[in-house]
Amino acid sequence: MAAEIHSRPQSSRPVLLSKIEGHQDAVTAALLIPKEDGVITASEDRTIRVWLKRDSGQYWPSIYHTMASPCSAMAYHHDSRRIFVGQDNGAVMEFHVSEDFNKMNFIKTYPAHQNRVSAIIFSLATEWVISTGHDKCVSWMCTRSGNMLGRHFFTSWASCLQYDFDTQYAFVGDYSGQITLLKLEQNTCSVITTLKGHEGSVACLWWDPIQRLLFSGASDNSIIMWDIGGRKGRTLLLQGHHDKVQSLCYLQLTRQLVSCSSDGGIAVWNMDVSREEAPQWLESDSCQKCEQPFFWNIKQMWDTKTLGLRQHHCRKCGQAVCGKCSSKRSSYPVMGFEFQVRVCDSCYDSIKDEDRTSLATFHEGKHNISHMSMDIARGLMVTCGTDRIVKIWDMTPVVGCSLATGFSPH
C-alpha cells in the first residue's frame, strides 16, 4: 500500500520519506495527524482513509470508509478528533475518530451546499463548521444543532477559505480572482472589503493571525501577500511558479512561505527580507522613453508620419514602453520576480548582479499536486494530487531545523 523511501539526505531539497498508493481516483485532501505517524486522506474515489505507519515503515489503512459521493474537501480538528468531509453533492459530513485511530463514528450530515464543497474550517470556540462551495456561497452551520446559521452568495464559484478565529473574519477566494473579507455573526454577516489583484481564479489562501498577513495563490501562477494588519494596502507579488498555485503554508517562526503548484513545483520563499511592492502599470498614448506613438494614437502617428508601436510595461518601474526600449530581460527577486521579466533599458542598467540573487528555493515534487498541508512542529509536509499518490516529505533541509526544535535564529 505504501513504500518507505530511504533517500540519501540532500542538504538543499525536501526529502521524500514515504509514498502512499491505493486510491482509485484523485486525492483531494491529505492531512498529517499531529504527534502521530498517520495521514488522513479524502478522495474522488468516495473514500476517507486513515493511514498509520506500521513497524515495517509502511503506511496501511487503519480506517477505510466509503461515502455516497466523491470527497472534495476535508478538515480535521485534532484535540476533539473530529473529521469534516465535504462532498461533490454539497453535503458536509462529520465523524469522530477513536483515540487509537482504528475506528471512526459518523456524527451528522450538514446540508451546507447545493454543489461541490471546496473548503471547510471548523471553529471549536463558536462550534461552527464554515464551508465554501461551487454553489457560489460561504455557509456557516452550528455543530451542536446541525442548523444553518448563515449564508452569503458571490458572483462566481467560491474556491477557498481562511478564517480568523479571534475576530470571526472569513476570507473567501473565488473563480473571478477576487477575495472577499467577511465578518461572520451568529445569523448574519457583513462584507468588510474585497481584494482584487489576481488575473486568474484564486485556488488557495493562507492567513497568518500573528502578523495579520493573507497569502493567496491563483491560476495566474502567482502569489500575492496582502498586509492586512498594516492597514496601508501594501501587497507583495511573488512569481516563480510555472503553473497554477494550489496550496500555501506560512511558517511564522522562520518567516518562510511554502507553496505548491499543479505541475509539482514546491517553492520556499524567504519572507524575512525587505521586499518591494511591484508598481502599478502606467498608461500612455506614446512610449514614455522614446515618445514614439502607440498604435491607437492615430493623431501622433499622422503628425509624425510614423507607424504605431505595441505597448509594453517595465515590471520594475511600471512605465509604458515600446519593444525597442524594453528589449532586455532580468529577474528581480526583491520585487517577487524570480524568473526573467521585461524591464526597460534604464531599469536594466540599474539592476546590479546582487539584486538578481534569488530569495526563494524551488524543488520538484514529481507529481501533480492539488493539495498540500504541513505539520509545522515536525517540519513534515504531505502532498497529494490527480495521480492518486500521497507523498510525505521531510522539509527541514529546506526550511531549517529550527522548526523541529522550536528554536528561531532571529
Curated annotation (Swiss-Prot):
Keyword Metal-binding (UniProt): yes
Short name of any one Pfam family annotated for the protein: WD40
Superkingdom of this protein's organism: Eukaryota
Residues the entry annotates as binding Zn(2+) 1: C287, C290, C322, C325
InterPro entries: G-protein_beta_WD-40_rep, WD40/YVTN_repeat-like_dom_sf, WD40_repeat_CS, WD40_repeat_dom_sf, WD40_rpt, WDFY1/WDFY2, WDFY1_FYVE, Znf_FYVE
Binding site for Zn(2+) 2: C314, C317, C344, C347
One of the record's GO molecular function terms: zinc ion binding
Keywords, alphabetical: Endosome, Metal-binding, Phosphoprotein, Repeat, WD repeat, Zinc, Zinc-finger
GO terms (BP aspect): positive regulation of toll-like receptor 3 signaling pathway; positive regulation of toll-like receptor 4 signaling pathway
ZnF endpoints (FYVE-type): 281-352
Cellular compartment(s): Early endosome
WD repeat spans: 22-61, 66-105, 112-150, 153-192, 197-236, 240-279, 364-403
Modified residues (Phosphoserine): S408
GO cellular component terms, semicolon-separated: cell junction; cytosol; early endosome; Golgi apparatus; intracellular membrane-bounded organelle; nucleolus; nucleus
CDD domains on file: FYVE_WDFY1
Record note on quaternary structure: Binds PtdIns3P in vitro with high specificity over other phosphoinositides. Interacts (via WD repeat 2) with tyrosine-phosphorylated TLR3 (via TIR domain) in response to poly(I:C). Interacts with TICAM1 in response to poly(I:C). Interacts with TLR4 in response to LPS.
Domains as described in the record: The FYVE-type zinc finger domain mediates interactions with phosphatidylinositol 3-phosphate in membranes of early endosomes and penetrates bilayers. The FYVE domain insertion into PtdIns(3)P-enriched membranes is substantially increased in acidic conditions. The FYVE domain is required for its function in regulating TLR3 signaling.
Function of the molecule: Positively regulates TLR3- and TLR4-mediated signaling pathways by bridging the interaction between TLR3 or TLR4 and TICAM1. Promotes TLR3/4 ligand-induced activation of transcription factors IRF3 and NF-kappa-B, as well as the production of IFN-beta and inflammatory cytokines.
Protein name per UniProt: WD repeat and FYVE domain-containing protein 1
Organism: Homo sapiens (Human)
